Regions:
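N-terminal Lys/Arg-rich, disordered targeting/topogenic segments
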Residues: 1-20
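Hydrophobic membrane-insertion alpha-helices, especially the h-region
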Residues: 21-38
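Structural motif
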Residues: 39-41, 91-93, 129-133, 168-174, ...
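A short beta-strand motif characteristic of beta-propeller blades
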Residues: 55-69, 98-106, 137-144, 180-187, ...
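Beta-strand-rich domains and repeat architectures in extracellular enzymes and scaffolds
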Residues: 61-93, 105-114
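Repeated scaffold domains used in trafficking and secretory/extracellular systems
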Residues: 70-78, 108-119, 147-156, 188-199, ...
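Non-cytosolic head/periplasmic domains of membrane-anchored proteins
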Residues: 102-201, 205-206, 212
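Solenoidal tandem-repeat scaffolds enriched in leucines and small polar residues
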Residues: 169-259
Length: 381
């Protein structure tokens, strides 16, 4: 007798097999996608950086190379322990001196700001509520605050000052040690605009107004004391930076003048200038201020090395962009040139570069030229 086949049952079985097969395919795709997502911090930076480095190591340009920065706009670069830290929109990339990528770390800071010393980098975002400190090997610590961050400062020994807004006071100052432990807090009645560490305390630059003009007042506090140790007289200028001197005094670079103070807050000397402040730097009790006179298409370099005398002045018939101090030498990014000077105003070197760069870094015998979306290394002339 012929075998009877249930056609309807057979069709149902085939449909179930097809549905099961489709389900397994979809499940595999979902699992693979989940695996990619959970491991994105490992593979995405590598994809993001494909084609980002162009090496140029021929005989004519020995030691030179070019890094292309993903995203370009608003990146920030500094050297930390001979490693180039490049802060971008979502990641911080760490390169060795030869342009080889050593590490890439994700951060969650919008419009991130980076402050560095010789060994570490402080990362935060203006109006954010968290900050972190990294070194070349790893992120060391991250802290969260209740109020929005105005700015942060990283000391040479790794201490961190964070200034936040406040609903009750003008602002709040938080001091952390090098391990991330909170060691000091202060509710401030005046608005802080800059902070410079000085021994076991810090010099705070506050801004206010007198007779309708902006003034800067310095206050020195010690972390073991609640009272302010000294307060300076008002300086009729908007402070850009305050720097601690080795003798316990301070040097202020303002928008219209500079000022020296002794270790009790008394004004020693000040110097007023006409011109717009472009850039400044300070190291080892010596300062450099770069000004521009737009109407004359002229730049002015002021060199400060002695609190008792006026600065050495150097003039340029072009608009310069950036000034750096390293090993007691001033490096100036001119229009299509890098110049170097001693603090006596003597020009030590000058060589031409592409004019498409906005900032210079120097590490060892190399210059690192920062442009819109690229970083070029070149030897110093």
């Amino acid at each position: 007798m012929a075998k009877t086949v249930d056609v309807v049952l057979l069709r149902e079985r085939r449909k179930r097999k097809r549905r099961l097969f489709r389900f397994l395919i979809i499940l595999a795709v979902v699992l693979f996608g989940a695996l990619l997502y959970t491991s994105r911090e490992k593979w995405f930076p590598k994809l993001e950086k494909i084609g980002s480095q162009h090496a140029n190591l021929n005989a004519e340009t020995e030691g030179e190379f070019m890094l292309t920065v993903s995203g370009g706009v608003d990146y920030h670069a500094e050297f930390v322990n001979n490693n180039l830290f490049v802060l971008c929109d979502k990641y911080i990339y760490i390169y060795d001196m030869n342009g080889e990528l050593q590490d890439s770390r994700q951060h969650a800071y919008s419009n991130a700001i980076m402050k560095t010393n010789q060994d570490k980098a402080l990362l935060y975002s203006h109006n954010g509520t968290s900050f972190r400190v990294d070194n070349s090997k790893k992120m060391l610590f991250e802290e969260n605050l209740d109020d929005s961050i105005w700015f942060g400062v990283l000391s040479d020994d790794g201490r961190v000052a964070i200034i936040t807004g406040s609903e009750t006071y003008a602002c709040c100052l938080y001091i952390y040690d090098a391990t991330g432990k909170l060691i000091y807090t202060r509710n401030c009645l005046e608005r802080l605009i800059d902070v410079s560490f000085q021994n076991q305390g810090c010099i705070c630059a506050t801004i206010g107004s007198e007779n309708g003009e902006v003034v800067t007042v310095l206050k020195y506090i010690q972390f073991q004391e609640s009272d302010v140790q000294w307060t300076s007289e008002a300086l009729p200028a908007l402070c850009w930076h305050v720097y601690s001197m080795k003798d316990g005094g301070a040097f202020v670079i303002g928008d219209t003048k500079t000022a020296y103070y002794n270790n009790t807050g008394d004004l020693i000397n000040s110097y007023a200038y006409n011109g717009s402040l472009i850039d400044c730097d300070f190291f080892n009790n010596q300062g450099a201020v770069l000004l521009k006179n737009e109407s004359r298409r002229q730049s002015i370099l002021l060199l400060f090395s002695d609190s008792s005398t006026n600065p050495v002045t150097v003039y340029f018939d072009s608009i310069c962009k950036n000034v750096k101090i390293q090993d007691n030498i001033i490096y100036l990014l001119d229009a299509g040139k890098i110049r170097s000077y001693s603090f006596t105003g003597t020009e030590l070197s000058c060589f031409e570069i592409n004019d498409a760069y906005e900032k210079i870094l120097k590490n060892g015998k190399y210059f690192y030229l920062l442009g819109y979306d690229r970083i070029q290394r070149m030897s110093g002339g």
